[in-house]
Swiss-Prot record:
Residues 60-248 form the ABC transmembrane type-1 domain. This is Spermidine/putrescine transport system permease protein PotC. One of its GO terms (cellular component) is plasma membrane. PROSITE patterns: ABC_TM1. Belongs to the binding-protein-dependent transport system permease family. CysTW subfamily. It comes from Shigella flexneri. Pfam families: BPD_transp_1 (PF00528). The lineage of its organism: Bacteria, Pseudomonadati, Pseudomonadota, Gammaproteobacteria, Enterobacterales. The chain crosses the membrane at residues 10-30, 66-86, 109-129, 131-151, 176-196, 232-252. GO terms for biological process: transmembrane transport. The keyword Repeat does not apply. It is a multi-pass membrane protein. It is found in: Cell inner membrane.
Length: 264
């Protein structure tokens, strides 16, 4: 009994530590007090001010554009890479797998400096393209690992049966592998989108003043105090994230039902 109470209290403390700051942020986005120290009444004026803040909205647009493009390219390349690692044997396969984990485990500052040096050597101007390439680079391994983990759960006999019946490699990929892997592909896209939207360290090294993104804009603003407009923007992003997570879960569940359940 005491152990159960201790476990319950410990879990309650963990969840409170995680979610109370988020709740405070949401509440302060509707607080008429500019400093959010105490409640002075309900208001939506901070959302109105946010809609009129051109620099913040432009940074948000840049971040959304970057996240969509980087997540899409990373998911496309990463899914095909995962299929290649799963289906084929080729020279250097262990090296490719190992390098993916190196990228995942490398500190952000190491990756940021490495990419910056690469762009300087290649003469690439810091801006949209350097930022896009960088975001694809650090999102790619997460997609590969997510999709590859799903592929490892497939029944290989299904693929062998399709091949015995005369199906080409492309047909197997299109008719069997991709439909069954689609929940993992969707999860990889959502994860890549989140990583791109959230990145500060790498982006601060590889972007230029011509293409400012939201995390860097917010970081520069909170140095002098948290603005209520930032609270409002963070609340909107939180709602969008929840919608994306729920949508991805629904898509994954529908795909699983459509394929007759998980393949063991």
């Amino acid at each position: 009994m005491i152990g159960r109470l201790l476990r319950g209290g410990f879990m309650t403390a963990i969840y409170a530590y995680l979610y109370i700051p988020i709740i405070i942020l949401i509440v302060n986005s509707f607080n008429s007090s500019r400093f959010g120290i105490n409640w002075q009444g309900f208001t939506t004026k901070w959302y109105s001010l946010l809609m009129n803040n051109d620099s913040l909205l432009q940074a948000a647009q840049h971040s959304l554009t970057m996240a969509v493009f980087s997540a899409t390219f990373a998911t496309l390349i990463g899914s095909l890479t995962a299929v290649a690692l799963y289906r084929y044997r080729f020279r250097g396969k262990p090296f490719v797998s190992g390098m993916l984990f190196v990228v995942m485990m490398s500190p952000d500052i190491v990756m940021a400096i490495s990419l910056l040096v690469l762009f300087m050597l290649l003469g690439i101007q810091l801006g949209f393209w350097s930022l896009l390439f960088s975001h694809i680079t650090f999102c790619l391994p997460f997609v590969v690992v997510t999709v590859y983990s799903r592929l490892k759960g497939f029944d290989v006999r299904m693929l062998e049966a399709a091949k015995d019946l005369g199906a080409s490699e492309f047909t197997i990929l299109r008719k069997i592998i991709l439909p069954l892997a689609m929940p993992a592909v969707a999860a990889g896209w959502v994860l890549s989108f989140t990583l791109s939207m959230d990145d500060v360290v790498v982006s601060s090294f590889v972007t230029g003043p011509s293409y400012e993104i939201l995390p860097l804009k917010i970081y520069s603003m909170v140095k002098v105090g948290v603005s209520p407009e930032v609270n409002a923007l963070a609340t909107i992003l939180l709602v969008l994230s929840l919608v994306m997570v729920i949508a991805s879960q629904l898509i994954a569940r529908d795909k699983t039902k459509g394929n007759g359940g998980d393949v063991k």
